[in-house]
Amino acid sequence: MNVKIDGRRKINSNVIVPPDKSISHRSIMIGSLANGVTEIENFLFSDDCLATINCFKNLSTDIEIRNDKIIVKGNGFALSAPKQILDCQNSGTTTRLLLGILSTQEFESILTGDSSLKKRPMKRVTVPLSQMGAEFEFLEKEDFLPIKVKGSKKLKPIEYTLPIPSAQVKSALIFASLKAEGKSVIKESPKSRDHTELMLKHAGANIKSWEKDGVYTVEILPSQISSIKIKIPSDISSAAFFIVLALICEGSSVVIENCILNPTRTGIIDVLKQMGAEIKIEDVENRNGELVGKIVARSSNLRGVKVEKNDIPRIIDEIPILAVAAAFAEGKTIIDHASELRVKESDRIKTTVEMLKSFGAECYELENGLEIIGSREKLKSAVVNSYKDHRIAMAASIMACAVEGESTILDADCVSISFPNFYDILFSSTKKI
Ligand SMILES: O=C(O)C1=C[C@@H](OP(=O)(O)O)[C@@H](O)[C@H](O)C1
Ligand SMILES: C=C(OP(=O)(O)O)C(=O)O
């Protein structure tokens, strides 16, 4: 599906942003491993999260959708051998976290995914999980899906420092450590998103975590998990598109309520504020360890910024939309130390640069990042390739709203990976200036 957007639009409304993708995946996984019935409210029914549900159904977890809630009947880590190949579709989170969980199971399973996921590296999880005693076989190409995994009931605990901060790698190791024979210690610097730790603590697992001298440590003891009730907040990674829309379109403002404000996720707010964005955070509350609150943003004169290396993990999924904001800012923006972008759904350094250039922006690819020279006056409508990457499609759509003329976003249906009603909300909440 291609989407046409008639530009020079503005927004002046409340937007109901979809539920958080990271927390939605984890709610199904932790619910499946818990003893008892987990109730999930406000689950994200997007392609990635549906892939997680299907994998766990295939592992015999009883998952039922009842009046907008999801009911997961957990069997305390007693999963059953899948009858089919586990298809993780486009979802890196599903794959890597599942590899950690399946390391605790004695049966054999095969995981695969779509053509994009089959290009994403998996040794980052299989190497440490093998040290714990799980067995992996790459069935086509070393480091990539499809993978055969055979776990063990006698996993060794691990002491491991992540070479690159990653919530997916950390979470895979935490899940495996819950069933290891002793205490595991995982370290990373700087800290990546900690939803797994927070949700497992809430479910009674024996986990401690702390930060000291810039190093984040998680200590895990063998644990049982209790069932929980979860109400999932809105996803700040999805909210980011509407925040930037309000910032770059004249006479605009947006209000997003009930949004996740976990400090490992709010890098986009901090960097946009450094760029001069008028953003306010209000009504913050703590919901079982997760901060949730309201975001208000309005049109602002932005200036370029150099993004700090330590902020990269806190902003990793928001870099395509941050780059759009940078194209409307005055001066240069430098985003470096972001080599991880090369192994997302697309090579997001290349695809973000291509997308911005189609609109006439001045921007350059760096080895591990990108440089954007703000040039609001030069920007024009475009026909843009999304490279079937949801975050590129949405970032391009926001850019298309702000420039003059009609733009076309190619293969825009990929937004269903994380934000299925993105275009309904975009067209109903904006109007031509
Ligand atoms: O754990 C998660 O839910 C995620 C972790 C991040 O990936 P990495 O762990 O590879 O950095 C992020 O890019 C992804 O969208 C979601
Ligand atoms: C990278 C992403 O997700 P995943 O790694 O789960 O595919 C994303 O949503 O931008």
UniProtKB/Swiss-Prot annotation:
Keywords: Amino-acid biosynthesis, Aromatic amino acid biosynthesis, Cytoplasm, Transferase. One of its GO terms (molecular function) is 3-phosphoshikimate 1-carboxyvinyltransferase activity. It holds the Pfam family EPSP_synthase. One of its GO terms (biological process) is amino acid biosynthetic process. Pathway: Metabolic intermediate biosynthesis; chorismate biosynthesis; chorismate from D-erythrose 4-phosphate and phosphoenolpyruvate: step 6/7. Phosphoenolpyruvate binds at residues 21, 92, 120, 168, 348, 391. Transmembrane segments: none annotated. One of its GO terms (cellular component) is cytoplasm. The active site is at residue 317. It is an enzyme of class 2 (transferase). Belongs to the EPSP synthase family. NCBIfam families: aroA. This is 3-phosphoshikimate 1-carboxyvinyltransferase. The lineage of its organism: Bacteria, Bacillati, Bacillota, Bacillota incertae sedis, Caldicellulosiruptorales.
